[in-house]
């Protein structure tokens, strides 16, 4: 014999109206952009529905501190380009010339584990059209026809004594956060390498650094 309160509970449950379960919408194949991820974004990465009009604020502040003016766009895949220029002090020159701009057509990159991944063109956004990923990269200025000499990519560094040193201007890379897919199609936020500076590398001609 069941206790009286158990019988009452059983009768109550049997008399409850059945509640229809609404079908759950299929989950998106792309992971949502969670709020904590914003803290991991680099100023060199922009998530926007259109190409950014100018360099990141942090870059502008640094450029202003060193007296570097902004230039004109170089091509369709690099917007808001600026080139390093001589500082305001007379006689000062950069060891290596660099050019910076938004890369709008990046398709692949190398992740933190050294694997090539696909950089997704769109990032899902709640309540609106997806966002696109843009990367503000800094590279060594390419040597132009008739403008050879030190300070350009692949060339020697400006102001280095060639009798004692071998020098070369090379791009330096840093890691930034981006939405990517690996070779198995797994989508996720990963750290990828992009060009962020043009630096001078030195090698002693005598074999000693």
UniProtKB/Swiss-Prot annotation:
GO terms for biological process: adult locomotory behavior; ameloblast differentiation; cell surface receptor protein tyrosine kinase signaling pathway; epidermis development; ganglion mother cell fate determination; innervation; long-term memory; mechanoreceptor differentiation. Keywords: Cleavage on pair of basic residues, Disulfide bond, Glycoprotein, Growth factor, Secreted, Signal. Residues 22-79 form a propeptide. Residues 1-21 form the signal peptide. Disulfide bonds join 96-169, 140-198, 157-200. GO terms for cellular component: axon; dendrite; extracellular region; extracellular space; synaptic vesicle. Glycans are attached at residue 75. Belongs to the NGF-beta family. PANTHER family: NERVE GROWTH FACTOR NGF -RELATED, NEUROTROPHIN-4. Target-derived survival factor for peripheral sensory sympathetic neurons. May promote ameloblast differentiation and subsequent reduction in proliferation of ameloblasts. This is Neurotrophin-4. It comes from Rattus norvegicus (Rat).
């Amino acid at each position: 014999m069941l206790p009286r309160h158990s019988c009452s509970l059983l009768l109550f449950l049997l008399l409850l109206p059945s509640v229809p379960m609404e079908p759950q919408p299929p989950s998106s194949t792309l992971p949502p952009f969670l709020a904590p991820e914003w803290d991991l974004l680099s100023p060199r990465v922009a998530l926007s529905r259109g190409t950014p009009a100018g360099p990141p604020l942090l870059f502008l502040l640094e450029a202003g501190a060193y007296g570097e003016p902004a230039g004109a766009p170089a091509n369709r895949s690099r917007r808001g380009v600026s080139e390093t220029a001589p500082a305001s002090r007379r006689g000062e020159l950069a060891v290596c010339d660099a050019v910076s701009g938004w890369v709008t057509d990046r398709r692949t990159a190398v992740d933190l584990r050294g694997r090539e991944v696909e950089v997704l063109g769109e990032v899902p956004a709640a309540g609106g059209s997806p966002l696109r990923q843009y990367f503000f990269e800094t590279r060594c200025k390419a040597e132009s026809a008739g403008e050879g000499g030190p300070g350009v990519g692949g060339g020697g560094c400006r102001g280095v004594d060639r009798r004692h040193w071998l020098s070369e201007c090379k791009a330096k890379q840093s890691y930034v956060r981006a939405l990517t897919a690996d070779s198995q199609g797994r989508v996720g936020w990963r750290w990828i390498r992009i060009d962020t500076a043009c630096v001078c590398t030195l090698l002693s001609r005598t074999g000693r650094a």
